[in-house]
Amino acid sequence: MPGLIDAHSHIGGIRRSVLQFDDWGLRATLAYGVTTVFDPSSLSIDMLAYQDLIDAGQVIGPRLYTTSTAMFSYNRLRSLDDARDLVRRYRDFYRTRNVKQYRIGSRRDRQWIAMATRELEVMPTAEGAVDMKLGLTQVLDGFSGNEHAFGVFPLYRDVVELMARSGTSS
């Protein structure tokens, strides 16, 4: 069997500290057969250093991908151009093709992020925050991922069909 992929892994043990070249958490992840992890919102840019160290063989661990830090409301967007600039900075400086907005602001702000990511060929994901209305509007606006459950059970056919037709993961 090829390695497992953890598509929502917050590698907490390697955040906000001096880089460790012998991290037990990364080794344990491999020991359980997980060879690739994706962190949809690392709390620091340390993940970029770990990506490089793993790729260079300096640290033993699974292939590591991340959105880097999430886009928060302090990124005051005033226009679609501001959103393009923000997405471009993430894409170029964090070397990522995935970005996560974490309740960046109004729905208009989220729509600008969705439009900018489409234009710049970056995949947008969003913090669902267990809020049904927020989650559904993010799906309708074009986000490819909703990182947490809707928080409502059961989901009725209209929501299930919306998710299936949109291709949005949750």
Model-derived regions, located:
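Divalent-metal coordination cores built from histidine and acidic residues
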Residues: 3-12, 21-126, 130, 135, ...
